[in-house]
């Protein structure tokens, strides 16, 4: 044990940043090895503290480890004498620091510097092997054995030698900061477009700084090379720069035009949408419309990127005002048009109108989607819940005549804002944007005519893009009314009966088609009414096939339900979760 204690004591003096426990474990693990070998392992980094991360990049110093063995003690005992820069990294015991001739404040306390201390110590030892020689080892071994102080003159000589080796080593070995900073050579080549006199002065200063910092011997050769390269490239680039300037000037000139044309673009889009309706009434307006169509073509050709974001905001405000005025103007025209039944549009005119509106919408889509949003509400996370904005609007009673309410699941959402007559007060003109193509196709058109007194959902809406999004998606959209099972979660059909007694419950049953006979009847009703009204869109055909497929499954479910007592199932169905999720609902809230 005494030998182990002696080894630990000497190692503690040699490596004050190691804990005694770590050194004790190390010595006990390697009982048979000599002290010098343990010291060498620590200095080369083969052995580290238990909580230390190995840095394998330092292994390039491994071939020099044989020369480190004899100097390992000297590197650590004299590391604080090697100048102020290296002192905080390699601490040593306080008595050496106090007695050394160089003014250094090194504490004996163990520092938390990780393997940088031990591994870089090995590199120091390797660098010192050529210069410091045997005097350093002799002095260090004497200091370790006697724990006395050798003569001050020797230590001063050693300190001078160590300082000289450090300066040499700093020239060879760059620090991390020096490695990370970009080298000064390519910089003047990149900045060749700047003015020449300022550039030359900058190069002189940079070259002088670099000669001071990194001690380059060939700075002037570098300067000459860089000057030659620059002259060649400037000769090449002078014509190129002139052409660049010309193109830049040409690009800068048409920039004010699209900004001025944005406002007529709004008018042109709306005019293109209302044009087919207004042609029969207002023939004297045709020259204006032709002018605005020309402006539309110019706008499509002009670069859309030109207007900066700040001006687009003001343009969108002006565009909103213009839209409101124009809608107020077009509303009496539309009512006049409704009063004259002789002027009803034929199918060909409807198709032409739909095409014109589709073109206008395609051009306006980017503008409508983004610039008109109210800035505070433009983030999409608020609308993750489908039923979010519908509680704020008063609920519309579902039309329940002899006609099943949810005949067209993909159009029922749009009934709220497909009204042709009502002016929209928000920045987006939903009628001209998307309404007419859908009404042209949709069999719900008579219903939208009936409900045209209701204010559309898009009016006063702070997210116009929300309405566009839902109009273009054919999936199950939220419908209106509690009877039609409108909750953000999925409820069961029985909840409609239990919430409302009497007539309303029966209507809810009939709408949701919860019972077998009613389901079959209303399903056949749906098919006949759909085929009678108009040709089906492919989405509706898909829906009908889907419902027919569901009906087979529902009949099987029905047989099972008739066998089991229904009274037990109803309280379970009351619970909110998906336990009572049934596929026979015609108003599924989720995406199916």
Swiss-Prot record:
InterPro entries: DEF1_CUE. Residues 53-343, 438-457, 494-537, 552-592 are annotated as: Disordered. Residues 3-47 form the CUE domain. Keywords: Chromosome, Cytoplasm, DNA damage, DNA repair, DNA-binding, Nucleus, Telomere, Ubl conjugation, Ubl conjugation pathway. Ubiquitinated. It comes from the Eukaryota. Its main location: cytoplasm. Residues 65-88, 100-146, 258-309, 318-343, 552-575 have a biased composition (Low complexity). Residues 203-253 have a biased composition (Basic and acidic residues). GO terms for molecular function: DNA binding; transcription factor TFIIH holo complex binding; ubiquitin binding. GO terms for biological process: positive regulation of transcription initiation by RNA polymerase II; protein ubiquitination; regulation of protein complex stability; telomere maintenance; transcription-coupled nucleotide-excision repair; ubiquitin-dependent protein catabolic process. One of its GO terms (cellular component) is nucleus. It is found in: Cytoplasm; Nucleus; Chromosome, Telomere. Belongs to the DEF1 family. Homodimer; may form higher order oligomers. Interacts with the large RNA polymerase II subunit RPO21; the interaction is direct and serves to bridge RPO21 to the Elongin complex in a manner dependent on transcription stress. Interacts with RAD26. Recruits the ubiquitination machinery to RNA polymerase II for polyubiquitination, removal and degradation, when the transcription-coupled repair (TCR) factor RAD26 fails to efficiently displace stalled RNA polymerase II. Also involved in telomere length regulation. Binds DNA. This is RNA polymerase II degradation factor 1. It comes from Candida glabrata (strain ATCC 2001 / BCRC 20586 / JCM 3761 / NBRC 0622 / NRRL Y-65 / CBS 138). The gene is DEF1.
């Amino acid at each position: 044990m005494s030998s182990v204690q002696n080894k630990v004591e000497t190692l503690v003096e040699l490596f004050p940043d190691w804990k005694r426990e770590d050194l004790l474990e190390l010595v006990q693990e390697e009982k048979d090895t000599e002290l010098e070998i343990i010291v060498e392992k620590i200095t080369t980094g083969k052995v580290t503290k238990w909580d230390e991360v190995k840095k394998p990049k330092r292994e390039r110093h491994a071939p020099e480890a044989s020369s480190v063995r004899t100097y390992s003690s000297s590197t650590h005992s004299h590391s604080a004498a090697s100048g102020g820069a290296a002192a905080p990294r390699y601490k040593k015991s306080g008595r050496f620091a106090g007695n050394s001739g160089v003014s250094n404040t090194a504490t004996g306390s163990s520092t938390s510097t990780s393997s940088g201390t031990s591994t870089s110590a090995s590199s120091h030892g390797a660098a010192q092997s050529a210069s410091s020689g045997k005097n350093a080892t002799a002095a260090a071994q004497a200091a370790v054995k006697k724990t006395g102080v050798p003569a001050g003159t020797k230590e001063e000589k050693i300190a001078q030698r160590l300082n000289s080796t450090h300066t040499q080593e700093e020239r060879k070995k760059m620090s991390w900061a020096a490695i990370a900073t970009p080298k000064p050579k390519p910089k003047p080549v990149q900045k060749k477009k700047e003015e020449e006199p300022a550039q030359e002065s900058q190069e002189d200063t940079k070259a002088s700084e670099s000669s001071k910092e990194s001690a380059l011997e060939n700075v002037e050769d570098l300067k000459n090379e860089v000057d030659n390269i620059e002259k060649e490239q400037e000769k090449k680039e002078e014509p190129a720069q002139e052409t660049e300037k010309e193109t830049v000037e040409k690009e800068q000139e048409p920039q004010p035009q699209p900004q001025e044309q944005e406002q007529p673009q709004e008018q042109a889009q709306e005019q293109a949408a209302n044009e087919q309706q207004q042609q029969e009434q207002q023939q004297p307006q045709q020259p204006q419309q032709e002018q605005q169509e020309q402006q539309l073509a110019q706008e499509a050709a002009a670069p859309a990127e030109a207007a900066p974001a700040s001006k687009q905001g003001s343009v969108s405000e002006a565009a909103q005002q213009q839209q409101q005025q124009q809608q107020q103007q077009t509303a009496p025209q539309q009512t006049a048009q409704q009063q004259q039944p002789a002027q009803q549009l034929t199918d060909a005119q409807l198709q032409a109108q739909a095409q014109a509106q589709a073109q206008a919408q395609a051009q306006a889509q980017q503008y409508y989607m983004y610039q008109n949003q109210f800035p505070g509400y433009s983030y999409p996370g608020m609308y993750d819940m489908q039923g979010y904005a519908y509680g704020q609007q008063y609920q519309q009673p579902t039309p329940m005549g002899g006609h099943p309410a949810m005949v067209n699941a993909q159009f029922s959402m749009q009934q709220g804002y497909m009204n042709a007559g009502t002016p929209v007060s928000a920045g987006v003109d939903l009628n001209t944007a998307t309404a007419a193509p859908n009404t042209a196709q949709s069999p719900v058109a008579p219903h939208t005519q009936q409900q045209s007194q209701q204010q559309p959902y898009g009016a006063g809406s702070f997210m116009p893009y929300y309405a566009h999004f839902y109009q273009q998606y054919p999936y199950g959209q939220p419908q209106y009314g509690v009877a039609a099972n409108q909750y953000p979660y999925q409820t069961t059909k029985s909840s409609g009966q239990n919430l409302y007694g009497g007539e309303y419950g029966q209507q809810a049953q009939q709408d949701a088609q919860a019972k077998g006979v009613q389901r079959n009847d209303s399903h056949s009703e749906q098919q006949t009414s759909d085929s009678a009204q108009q040709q089906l869109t492919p989405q509706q055909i898909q829906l009908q096939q889907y419902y027919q497929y569901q009906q087979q499954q529902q009949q099987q479910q029905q047989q099972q339900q008739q066998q089991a007592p229904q009274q037990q199932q109803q309280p379970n169905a009351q619970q909110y979760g998906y336990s009572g999720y049934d596929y026979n609902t015609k108003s599924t809230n989720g995406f199916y």
